UniProtKB/Swiss-Prot annotation:
HAMAP family assigned: MraY (MF_00038)
Cofactor dependence: Mg(2+)
Role description: Catalyzes the initial step of the lipid cycle reactions in the biosynthesis of the cell wall peptidoglycan: transfers peptidoglycan precursor phospho-MurNAc-pentapeptide from UDP-MurNAc-pentapeptide onto the lipid carrier undecaprenyl phosphate, yielding undecaprenyl-pyrophosphoryl-MurNAc-pentapeptide, known as lipid I.
Keywords: Cell cycle, Cell division, Cell inner membrane, Cell membrane, Cell shape, Cell wall biogenesis/degradation, Magnesium, Membrane, Metal-binding, Peptidoglycan synthesis, Transferase, Transmembrane, Transmembrane helix
Name used for this protein in its record: Phospho-N-acetylmuramoyl-pentapeptide-transferase
Length: 366
């Protein structure tokens, strides 16, 4: 919103700063963190009063989790408030990518909110119907991908088809044009990312830090991919307009830091599906916009690992009646093995940092 003040920069030199994405990304981070810090306590108290027993605790989960009974959920509302505030204030709302990513974030957040609401009111870990939830997620994601694809095709240099193509790391020229089938592929990436983060969110601080790490990584990628000079130097695909997504990433990091203040063990609040679905969808959307969907598998490798552990567990149990892991997602397996919660969380953070660095390395290895 404030970017429009650039038009007055000839009268007020200070407004010229709003021209720079890096400045606005930093300002968005500060703004979103401030919003969460200021309104977080009131939101937590309100949710605690309204929810009573808080988020239901799985009966088959680790014994250490029962002491968390009564902790309110839906903390994603705090995160969404920060992201929305920082993005609306400092982002370019005329940018199609910005609007599409925010649409996915809010849409997935609304789905997660309804899911959390059902779980809290029923005091059950069974919320929104799985098929209905996935169907709505795919619809929201497909609409966003369609508009991002159209934007990428319209702005592609020399009438290229990058917007409807899958790009691969290490090989700039190797792309596969899917045509309109790219909408389905992109929607799958976004929905997969949203639900992968959702599965990861099971311990205090476990999901939010890897989310910030992955978001920061894609913020760098978005900034570079949206800059013709940097994209040409690194031999990555140039996608005009995606640099503006770095501002949203700044808001994500700020909101994430603010939320972590309250989510650090012992957590005063859980983000719930409200936050995890929204954040995962946001990261997946940026990966699709910047044509780094495959790199998403590397950068978000922790989320992929958590998801695969559930898929393997369910598949093998249905097939043989036996379990591969003591409990899934895999972070619970390590708890059952005797790791403390802090050991699991910090070690998974370390894995996230390593995967993020590996993902960034793909930008240079061509």
């Amino acid at each position: 919103m404030l970017i429009w003040l650039v038009e007055l920069s000839d009268k007020v030199q200070l407004f010229n700063l709003f021209r720079y994405i890096t400045f606005r990304a930093g300002a968005a981070m500060f703004t979103s963190a401030l919003i969460v810090f200021l309104f977080g306590p009131a939101i937590i108290n309100s949710l605690r009063v309204r929810q009573g027993k808080g988020q239901p605790i799985r009966a088959d989960g680790p014994q250490t989790h029962f002491k968390k009974a009564g902790t309110p959920t839906m903390g994603g509302l705090m995160i969404l408030a920060g992201i929305l505030g920082g993005s609306l204030l400092w982002g370019d709302l005329s940018n199609v990518y910005v609007v599409a990513v925010l649409m996915v974030t809010l849409g997935f957040g609304a789905i997660g909110f309804y899911d959390d609401y059902l779980k809290v009111t029923k005091q059950s870990d069974k919320g929104f119907s799985g098929k209905a939830r996935l169907g709505i997620e795919f619809l929201i994601a497909a609409i966003a991908v369609f508009f991002m694809m159209k934007m990428a095709l319209a702005s592609a240099p020399h009438g290229g088809t990058l917007g409807s193509s899958i790009a691969f790391p290490f090989f700039k020229e190797f792309v596969i044009n899917l045509g309109y089938f790219f909408v389905l592929f992109g929607a799958f990436v976004i929905v997969g990312a949203g639900n992968a983060v959702n599965l990861t969110d099971g311990l205090d601080g476990l999901a939010i830090v890897p989310v910030m790490i992955a978001a920061a990584t894609f913020g760098v990628i978005a900034y570079l991919a949206g800059n013709a000079v940097f994209a040409n130097y690194l031999q990555i695909n140039f996608v005009p307009g995606t640099g503006e997504l770095a501002v949203i990433v700044g808001a994500v990091i700020g909101a994430g830091l603010g939320f972590l203040w309250f989510n650090a063990p012992p957590a005063a609040i859980f983000m719930g599906d409200t936050g995890s679905l929204a954040l995962g969808g946001l990261i997946g959307s940026i990966a699709v916009a910047t044509k780094h969907e495959i790199v998403m598998v590397i950068v978000g490798g922790l989320f992929v690992m958590e998801t695969l552990s559930v898929i393997i567990q369910v598949f093998w149990f249905k097939r043989t009646g036996r379990r591969v892991f003591l409990m899934a997602p895999i972070h619970h397996h390590f708890e059952k093995k005797g790791w403390t919660e802090s050991q699991v969380v910090i070690r998974f953070w370390i894995i996230s940092v390593g995967l993020a660095l590996l993902g960034l390395a793909t930008l240079k290895l061509r």
